[in-house]
């Protein structure tokens, strides 16, 4: 592969064995970037360093990280809402604020963003963000729009090698061991993968995952060690070790 791409990669098939694998590799001397984000423009100035952007929910193509909240076993939200979305200025992410007021009240702390969104397809998602001393329409501002950047749609895509990429900026969900684990890059419960010499960064929750078979016991551990052990036992019973 050469150059940069903003699109996620979904491998359609796997290799036949460890000696007959499919390899995804960046071309020698090329910097190939795969992102889960898109550049956004059209920011409107609100006050001081605060800017606002409104987008139709259709922009997100069925998955809206600013309506998607982080939750699951072993996650403590500390009394606030966390989203899988993110806002990036020149490649670096801002911090999600606890409320619109937290963004409107400028401070010397890390720049914040905040979003409001409804679930309807015809609705609007509005983002507010602090860009200290910067016009976001003259800089590169990106937002998360995809849950992963390299992840099979189905399990059993075996014997892949992924090498030499920059993979970044994905709206990954919380990944407890008791639920399906979707990473910025992940095998989706497939075997024989080699992931090497890649830069993996700016993932909301997790970078690399093995995955998990989905079943009726997802997120039902009640935060117990026994729940974790039973997750492993069920995987072995389903033939993972064969």
Language model features with spans:
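Extracellular polysaccharide-degrading/modifying enzymes targeting complex plant/algal/animal polysaccharides
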Residues: 1-189, 194, 199-201, 207-210, ...
